[in-house]
Amino acid sequence: MSRKKTPKSKAGSAPATSALPAANGPRPVRPGTARPGPEAPPNGPPQPGRSSVGGGGDFYDVAFKVMLVGDSGVGKTCLLVRFKDGAFLAGTFISTVGIDFRNKVVDVDGMKVKLQIWDTAGQERFRSVTHAYYRDAHALLLLYDVTNKASFDSIQAWLTEIQEHAQDDVVLMLLGNKVDSAQERAVKREDAEKLAKDYGLPFMETSAKTGLNVDLAFTAIAKELKQRHTKAPSEPRFQLHDYIKREGRGASCCRP
């Protein structure tokens, strides 16, 4: 298989619409198959005020688009920087404006998998920008802040948006971030596990500050996408739920 070279990063925006939750309760969201194919091309120029950092000269076999979504302040940018650079953005909170992305190539069972990870703004005024990027996303990491009950209460609204704008077979995972702030916890783990079970989502708690389960979340997504892309008859089917339950610290498998 010939390998491609990672291009420089770009980002952009386009408008779309929103939707309200269904009155008859949650519709299960099945962790599914990402549509195989080449990486999604950027939709426009970089947003002003933030730099887009690419993968430089890294080579890869296949690329997938992954989006980080959730309310503003839940730690999406910090989670991305922890995974990409192994660092923590301490200090003053700076909210993402519009959308930005970074690339990272990971080795999955001998295959070079490039994850093009899009960091989205959580504020309502940027929501239409986010909608435009759902349609060609292969996977979504939906975050809430365990110290912020309102961010958890917004999860069902985010799931409705995902159902409206994303592919039916998008891979979806729920992450409770900032678990390092145990004394400030406002969302019980049991409540998040119940929500994840209702929607059939894999779930784990993470910390961008300590790195808890951060690599695991992205690695699990990469393994799922790679396995669905190759579809080798002799290769056992990758079980996303079982993998994070086995490998994670404090992770759980939540099936309906």
From Swiss-Prot:
Disulfide bonds: none
Bilayer disposition of the protein: Lipid-anchor
Cofactor(s) recorded in Swiss-Prot or TrEMBL: Mg(2+)
Gene3D superfamilies named among the record's database cross-references: P-loop containing nucleotide triphosphate hydrolases
GO molecular function: GMP binding; GTP binding; GTPase activity
Localization annotation: Cell membrane
InterPro entries for this protein: P-loop_NTPase, Small_GTP-bd, Small_GTPase, Small_GTPase_Rab
Motif (Switch 2): 119-136
Motif (Switch 1): 86-101
The keyword Calcium is annotated on this UniProt entry: no
Bias-annotated ranges (Pro residues): 38-48
Alphabetical list of Pfam families matching this protein: Ras
EC number: 3.6.5.2
Residue numbers binding Mg(2+): 77, 96, 119
Annotated GTP binding sites: 72-78, 95-96, 122, 177-178, 180, 208-209
Gene Ontology biological process terms, A to Z: exocrine system development; Golgi to plasma membrane protein transport; regulated exocytosis; regulation of exocytosis; regulation protein catabolic process at presynapse; vesicle-mediated transport
Top enzyme class: hydrolase
UniProt-annotated stretches for the region Disordered: 1-53
Domain comment as written in the entry: Switch 1, switch 2 and the interswitch regions are characteristic of Rab GTPases and mediate the interactions with Rab downstream effectors. The switch regions undergo conformational changes upon nucleotide binding which drive interaction with specific sets of effector proteins, with most effectors only binding to GTP-bound Rab.
Entry function: The small GTPases Rab are key regulators of intracellular membrane trafficking, from the formation of transport vesicles to their fusion with membranes. Rabs cycle between an inactive GDP-bound form and an active GTP-bound form that is able to recruit to membranes different set of downstream effectors directly responsible for vesicle formation, movement, tethering and fusion. RAB26 mediates transport of ADRA2A and ADRA2B from the Golgi to the cell membrane. Plays a role in the maturation of zymogenic granules and in pepsinogen secretion in the stomach.
Family, per entry: Belongs to the small GTPase superfamily. Rab family.
Protein name (record): Ras-related protein Rab-26
Source taxonomy: Eukaryota, Metazoa, Chordata, Craniata, Vertebrata
